[in-house]
Each structure stands twice: as C-alpha cells, then as structure tokens.
C-alpha cells in the first residue's frame, strides 16, 4: 500500500473521534429477520423511571429508525481505507444472475486505474465490479414483478415498522387521525406490501449490485418520508477527506440517502471513497462529470461520453442517477420570460447543448439505451427537473409542467424495462401552489415517487433557506412526496460546511416527521408522546435523548442551568421555578389528590378560597403594603 491512502486515513481518524460515538442516550440494536444474515439496525433510546411524584412507573426503551450505519456502533472498528463490510454480497451472489468482471468496462475508469499520478488519492482496496448476466435484469422492480420477495424487501419492511409492536403503552400509541390524500397507509408494513409497491412503481429500493455495503431502504409515499443530503467537492473548495466526513456526518443526523454532486477534480476517486464507506444509497448527476471530460463545454458533449460515464459510475456502485432527459428543445424558449431562467445546472447544460446543435436532447433520444445500462446494475432513475422554477414568480409555469409531462412519458418507458424510477420536483413554489404540483405529478407520472428540493416558499431569506424550504417540504411531504432533498442555510450563498449540513438535515427531519404525522403513518406519534410525557415529568435527560438532536437540546438547556442538579429540577430557565405551567398543573393535581377531589374541583375550590381572601382584605383592587 502506498503512503497517500494512509494520509487520508490519518485525516479520517479525527472523523472517527468527532462523529462515531453513539448518539447520546442510545445504543445500536439489530432486529433479526428470517435468515441469519438479515439483521436490521435500529437505534434504541434508553429512558429513565418516572419520578415517584408522578407515579414511579418504568419507561421502556424506544426504538427509532437509524441511518448512521456502523459508525455509531462502538463494537465496530472503522477503517475507511478498507470500506464497510459488504452486507448484501451474499444475497446478490445467491440470485445467480450477475457475473464479476475482470476489470472496469469504462474507458475513463480504466485510464484512472492505471494513472500513477492518482496514487495519492486513490481508494486503496481494489474491487472488481459485477454486471447482469447476458439478457438478465437485476432490478428490484424486476424481481417484484415476478412475485419474488428479496432479502432487501424483507429488510425494509422490518426497518419501516421500527419495532412498533414493542410499544405496549396505550397512551404512547395514541395518535390523531391523519389525512393521507389517497395514499395507502398501512398499519403494519409487510414484505409482501413492499414487493407490491415496488412492482407497481409507487416505491423504489435503490440498491446497485456494486454497492453491497448499503443497508436497504425504501422511497415511496406509503412509507416513512425520507430525506436526502447533498455533499460534493467543487473546483474551489473541499477535498476527499472532507467529503467522506460530510457523508458520515450527514447519515449520523438522519440523511436517508446522500447525493455526491462533486464538480471539481478527482471526482472519480472522491466517489469511490464515498461509496465504499456509505451504508446509505448514493446518488449522482452524471452529466456533471461528463461535462468535466469535455473541459466544461456543453456543446462538446456526446452520447458516447455520457454512456461511458454512466457505466463508470454504475460499476463504482452509484444507486441512482439524476438524468435530465425531460429538457426538450421545444421547452427551452418557454423559459425566456422567466425572472430567473433555467437554474438547474443539469438543465442549463442540456439546454445549451440542444440550442448549440439545434437537436433534441440526446438523453431523451437515447433513453432506452440508458435503460439497458440501468437494469444491468440496478441503478434507479431520478428523472431530473431541469426546468424547475428558481423563484416563486416562475412557479408552475408552462416550462416546468411541460417537462413534468415528459417525465411521466419517460417513467412509463423505464417501467417497460423494469427500471426503478422516481421524479424530481421543485424548487421555489409559494404555499398555495404546492398541492397543484403534487397532484399533477401523481397524475402524469403514475404515482412514481416524488423527490423534491423543498420547495422554498419565499425568496426573501438568504441565509435561512433551510427554513423557507422546510415549510414547503412539510406541506408537499404531507401531500405525498416520498423524499425531500434538504436545503442548508448556505443555499444560494456558498458550499455548506459541516454545521450547515447538520442544520439542513435537522430542518428536513422535522419536515419529514411532520408530514408522517399529518398522513397518519402508524406509530409516527409515539416519539412525540414519549417526549411530551418526559417533559411533563421533568425527565430532562430523556427529553434530550428523545429529540432529533440530543446534543443541541442539552447544549441549550445547559447554557443557563448547567449543573447536574438542574437535570432533576421541576422548571427550566424560560419560566423559572414559580411560573412553570407544568409545575403549576402538577401542584393542582397534588392538591386534588390530597383532598380527595377532581382537578376541576380543586381549581374551583382554589378560586373560591382566593375570592374569600380578596373580600376579607377589603375588596380593594390596589392596596398599600
């Protein structure tokens, strides 16, 4: 092994120290499936006993969905230079429909492999890619349509249920009825339901056969709402070690998938490090790398260059590709009257190519050729919205909806090849126009999963667009969007750092959970109920641990009440000891219990006592003291 990977590995040691400790108050557990090698990870939050004053009962631990992979499991030794264990390798091999290649198929990949100048940044462990056998289709959709329940499907069924059956306290399971807008929300997710949804095209299970390290997950409106985090280096900022760190940081806080949007140098090598160390699906926009190969000249792009890029990335293990095949020549003039024109990088690249050659988008004309590649590796389509609105003034215009109609046409073509497909959506949309987007997408695209960037509901808050977009994300998630692409505070301003990534993920975890509550997803309210109970009982540590960001909650509390004794206090610094509404409520309950009366009677008695006291003191509103 050369010295350079060791340098990267040394840089990664700080990553391990910073982000690999368990989430406070919890531990990694595994739920056993039907076979010995099917163990589904979850995070179990330990809860303390209710204080005697409030009843003194035990509070059993609560299991929640976990995206952090082995990084938060202290029993696992992390070696970024070796990558993660190939969790699905045996499942893939057992199906007998893939073969290992002797080497890389793409000409670009082969060139990088033998370039000694790249030794300093190359991932050290060599791995031979796999591909479908001649004439075979290896997509999860293909299996689902043939009635096959794969281990991946069983895995996600167990994962989606979050051990809800272990919650026996009826007060924790209490939940408001949801409004699902026609979604088929199940009380319990079964492997058969997962298979049906994938076969129907309403859900995707993005798992490239060359990314066996990934833990299966599902994207669909009848499942938990997912979020995506974007990372990626650029020509002016960020390197490989930093991007791997951002990957681990993203999944620690709840990123269900991660998109590598790298546009700078060493795109290929950065992606290899990311995929080999990622337990979540990785998405890319292949046109970005294809453009790098022609020195940034969109007009110089060719189908051959793009095809080679697809194969290169598919053999590395990319799980889904954003492909802007709906940017048609006839739609480009429709953007001329927009305030912000075409804001999608991929959309602008393809629009420029179309105008330069005055030909139809080659991604559209070669779409079935692309399908042949996708089904040979089980790469899912994320059909890009290259004409999405870049400001609320441009929302829901002819260009945006024309492209959406074309994406619906392409979805049906992809399904003909059993290729898993989701649809990307806006963007910038005011609140009153959001539902129209969702309804049209369901209608035009046959209920294929919708994957939206926000949408941002106003354009006046640079520096706070994680908030402007989380508002729209919560709404469109409720209406039926399956996955929300996060927006960070740096949106429109610069490349996000680690704190920006965390802030963006938190905003979107809130939006996704709010959507699940509104849809009435089974068990969605359990965690809310558990936290509310802990709050009323002044179990401060449990409040922190049940929150989406335990570290932030504890940090804020300890800024004013830092002592250990304050974790037992029946108040916080907001109201203090004499004005805490929950403490007052408990005092009323205690008074009622002491005097053998109901809470209503206690309140009435207390009011009568105060009335008598007022009259006895002279019935004066103001008294000299």
Swiss-Prot record:
Q: Which residues bind [4Fe-4S] cluster?
A: 572, 575, 580
Requisite cofactors: [4Fe-4S] cluster
Identify the Pfam families for this entry.
Answer: ThiC-associated, ThiC_Rad_SAM
Please name the InterPro entries in this protein's record: ThiC (IPR037509), ThiC-associated_dom (IPR025747), ThiC/Bza_core_dom (IPR038521), ThiC/BzaA/B (IPR002817)
Q: Which domain of life is it from?
A: Bacteria
- GO molecular function list: 4 iron, 4 sulfur cluster binding; carbon-carbon lyase activity; zinc ion binding
What keywords sit in the KW lines?
A: 4Fe-4S, Iron, Iron-sulfur, Lyase, Metal-binding, S-adenosyl-L-methionine, Thiamine biosynthesis, Zinc
Cofactor binding mode and count: Binds 1 [4Fe-4S] cluster per subunit. The cluster is coordinated with 3 cysteines and an exchangeable S-adenosyl-L-methionine.
Question: Pathway listed for it?
Answer: Cofactor biosynthesis; thiamine diphosphate biosynthesis
Q: Does the keyword Zinc apply?
A: yes
Q: What EC number(s) are associated with this protein in UniProt?
A: 4.1.99.17
| One GO CC term, this protein | cytosol
Q: What class of enzyme is it?
A: lyase
What positions does the entry give for Zn(2+) binding?
A: 428, 492
Which reaction(s) does the protein catalyse, per the Swiss-Prot or TrEMBL entry? Answer: 5-amino-1-(5-phospho-beta-D-ribosyl)imidazole + S-adenosyl-L-methionine = 4-amino-2-methyl-5-(phosphooxymethyl)pyrimidine + CO + 5'-deoxyadenosine + formate + L-methionine + 3 H(+)
**Annotated residues for binding of substrate:** 230, 259, 288, 324, 344-346, 385-388, 424, 451
Q: Does the keyword Ion transport apply?
A: no
User: Which GO terms are recorded in the biological process aspect for this UniProt protein?
Assistant: thiamine biosynthetic process; thiamine diphosphate biosynthetic process
Membership in a protein family: Belongs to the ThiC family.
PANTHER family linked: PHOSPHOMETHYLPYRIMIDINE SYNTHASE, CHLOROPLASTIC, THIAMINE BIOSYNTHESIS PROTEIN THIC
Q: What does this protein do?
A: Catalyzes the synthesis of the hydroxymethylpyrimidine phosphate (HMP-P) moiety of thiamine from aminoimidazole ribotide (AIR) in a radical S-adenosyl-L-methionine (SAM)-dependent reaction.
Subunit field text: Homodimer.
Q: What is this protein called?
A: Phosphomethylpyrimidine synthase
